[in-house]
């Protein structure tokens, strides 16, 4: 017979689990940013992906996947709708045919330019709700 977990443990996890609180906070922030990005036709994840491609030289997939904390398969799936909309292109790396470069197109740059002021305003609003956003940011980065 398996040992049952006491009901009190449910409250312990609810009240103290850092993973649970991080998940809930991430979902709340994602929902908030999704709502404000809707008028420009982006989700919060798409904004982050486009921003990660906003570089002088198109990056290969691997560093972008690392930055966004996703595997290449997930990144490929996330790129598909952006490719269909003409915001991103995936090109063969001329220096190494096995690699792919991720190119932010001009329409991608334009939509990103419209989204950045929205991000700034919403981000400022979120930071104003926090007691110490810089400490929170450092602590979140430390977990990575």
Task: List each model region and its residues.
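The short coil/loop that forms the "turn" connecting the two helices of the helix-turn-helix
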Residues: 42, 56-59, 70
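Pre-recognition alpha-helix immediately N-terminal to the DNA-recognition helix
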Residues: 21, 48-51, 110
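Residues within the alpha-helical elements of helix-turn-helix
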Residues: 67
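N-terminal leader segment of winged-helix/HTH proteins
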Residues: 1-40, 128, 135-138
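Residues that mark the N-terminal boundary/hinge immediately upstream of a DNA-recognition element
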Residues: 43-45, 60, 105
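Charged, amphipathic alpha-helical coiled-coil/dimerization segments
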Residues: 58, 80-138
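Basic amphipathic alpha-helical segments that dock to polyanions
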Residues: 50, 64, 82-85
């Amino acid at each position: 017979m398996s040992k049952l977990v006491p009901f009190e443990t449910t409250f312990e996890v609810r009240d103290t689990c850092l993973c649970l609180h991080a998940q809930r906070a991430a979902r709340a922030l994602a929902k908030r940013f999704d709502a404000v990005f809707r008028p420009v036709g982006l989700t919060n994840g798409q904004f982050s992906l486009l921003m990660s491609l906003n570089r002088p030289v198109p990056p290969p997939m691997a560093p972008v996947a690392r930055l966004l904390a996703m595997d290449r398969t997930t990144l490929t799936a996330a790129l598909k709708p952006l490719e269909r909309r003409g915001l991103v292109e995936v090109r063969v790396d001329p220096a190494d045919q096995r690699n792919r470069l991720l190119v932010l197109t001009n329409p991608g740059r334009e939509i990103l330019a419209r989204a950045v002021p929205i991000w700034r305003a919403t981000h400022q609003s979120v930071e104003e709700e926090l007691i110490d956003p810089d400490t929170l940011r450092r602590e979140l980065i430390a977990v990575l």
